[in-house]
Regions:
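A detector for small-residue-rich transmembrane helices and their helix-helix packing motifs
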Residues: 3-215
């Protein structure tokens, strides 16, 4: 009986360990984006009209919720796929390194800051447009990952500073090749993600967060 109890207990620990390895936040955020995209195939006109972001919606109507809702809308399958691949696989590393609470703060803060810089760009140029997509938040994860790589003596999860820099430059370059890409949101997300990662890695334990050890 004792042997059976020990085997069950050990099996429970192994299951918990396996569950802890799953990047739940990245997985859930990816799933939500996919579900919303599928919903847009049926209710796209309503969702895009009510969820896309532009500074005009903030100034005229005070619809600040659009800073967040626009992050979960995508124009087409390639737009969604590009963002979700980076969100899941890049986010997985960040989430496992800094924890779920910090990860969520980093993700949403970067997305919001990306949209805010986009708003500043609209005001400064007088060119107003509606924008959608999670790329501001995704670039925030890339910026956060860049900080983690630098903070860990130039390498984290087999990713070097050189590889990170090349990935960022290629991503930004491809964005500037298209007039449809919101590069202001990309830059805003990237910079805020880097800064947020620095700040989040130097604060104490957050509410709802288990004790952890930073390597």
């Amino acid at each position: 009986q004792d042997g059976g109890y020990m085997r069950i207990q050990q099996s429970g620990w192994e299951m918990k360990r396996d569950l802890d390895r799953i990047p739940w936040c990245s997985a859930i955020l990816t799933a939500v984006n996919v579900i919303v995209f599928l919903a847009c195939q049926f209710y796209g006109n309503v969702l895009y009209a009510q969820g896309s972001f532009s500074i005009l919606y903030l100034i005229r109507n005070g619809e600040y919720y659009r800073l967040v809702t626009a992050m979960f809308l995508h124009a087409d399958i390639s737009h969604l796929a590009n963002n979700m691949i980076l969100l899941y696989f890049g986010g997985e590393i960040v989430e496992k390194t800094i924890g779920k609470v910090r990860y969520l703060i980093l993700f949403f803060l970067s997305g919001i800051c990306g949209n805010l810089l986009s708003a500043v760009y609209e005001l400064s140029t007088g060119s107003f447009y509606e924008s959608i997509g999670a790329s501001g938040a995704v670039f925030g994860l890339i910026g956060g990952l860049l900080y983690l790589v630098i903070a860990r003596k130039g390498r984290a999860a087999s990713i070097s500073v050189q590889r990170m820099a090349l990935m960022i430059l290629l991503s930004l370059y491809s964005g500037f090749q298209s007039v449809r890409v919101n590069n202001a949101a990309h830059l805003g997300g990237l910079l805020s993600g880097f800064l947020a990662a620095f700040l989040l890695c130097h604060v104490g334990r957050l509410p709802g967060e288990r004790a952890r050890r930073m390597e």
